[in-house]
Amino acid sequence: QWPDGDKKITTDYGFVNGSLDTDGKMAVGLTFLNNHEVFTDYNLFQVNGAFAYNININSDWKLRLGIEAGYANKNYNFSSILLADQITKTTGSITDVSGDPSLAGYKESFGYFDISSGLLLYDDNFWFGVALKHLSTPNIAFTDVADVPLSMFLSVQGGYSFDIGSFDFIFRDDVNLLVTANYMRQSQYNRLDFGGAFEFDKFTLGTTISLNPEGKSDESQILTSINPFASIQIQRFVLGY
């Protein structure tokens, strides 16, 4: 985000997963997340292991249950902070060390364990899912004496794929209209994303809209972003933007 400015934020995410059996009922995965803020030198690295189990309710409906657990490390370079007692009033020179007691007891890095779970109900056209992260509400304070629990994160999502036939005057492939929605909430913060996409045989074209449904001030904006996207599939390779 903001790659050319002082507020640059870089996020890297990777994953690998696979089935444990031939019928695809059980699967495991591994995820990696690294988030870095240039302007604060704050960094979060997390690695999680995941397990999912699929239940065939009947010939059409399926229920997938999942759990994820892992370890996270937060790092904040307090040495990059400039405090008032480091500035010499007469000359304006800056010293490297601060005697400010407010920094006493702070740790530059610490780690914690985290756990999440979720479920997904779906058939060939419809899906509905719920996920709850940070079930253990770990303490994320940078001091040993403080208690700052990480609030649980709730995500509720759903979608439906409509078969709208073919556009013979443009494409001869059948076209599906995909409609999706996702509500997220953590503590007093919330967000609602919804959108749609046309799914052709080899590519997808659509857009999503992000809303702030519960504004916390008179200056809060309901519409926060409009996000178009597209993808193309070549055999088993998918390229999206």
Positions of PLM-derived features:
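Subset of outer-membrane beta-barrel
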Residues: Q1-Y241
